[in-house]
Amino acid sequence: MKTDTWKGRDWIAETDYTREEIETLLDVAAELKRAFVLGQDHDLLHRKTLFMVFYNASLRTRNSFEAGMTQLGGHAHFLDVAKIYAPAFANQLKASHSEDIADSARTLSRMGNGIAIRCFGDAVGWQWGMGNAVVREFARWSDAPVINMECDWYHPCQALADI
């Protein structure tokens, strides 16, 4: 392993990590994928929970995160904002429909080990940059690392997969 400086850090934009950190992530991912293909189990994420907050529908992103967490011994908890009180900015709260992002981030980070968020387009009224603002607001208040599963500015996990 070249570095472990990315551990415990948010990943919101592709540029949040150095080249060396990205190379390490790719090396670790390749080794874990190889082990999985060979039937070697890993408990790297044993007793770890990832809360996945989806403001937008997803097939590939949701399933890849859920499968990855399961294959590494962890649990991915799916949160569909259409079926829960949707996390929102304090000035955009609607009674019986939403909760403050700050409160949501603090609560989820106390119960889990990471928060992943997908937010863009219709979910934020097609206001350019608001999806990114939602992800960054979660990161501001969370004590656990926040992963951007896609916003209107960045899609770092897809960028990594494209390499």
Predicted regions span which residues?
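Positively charged, low-complexity intrinsically disordered leader regions
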Residues: 1-63, 67
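Phosphate/diphosphate ligand-binding glycine-rich loop within oxidoreductases
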Residues: 43-163
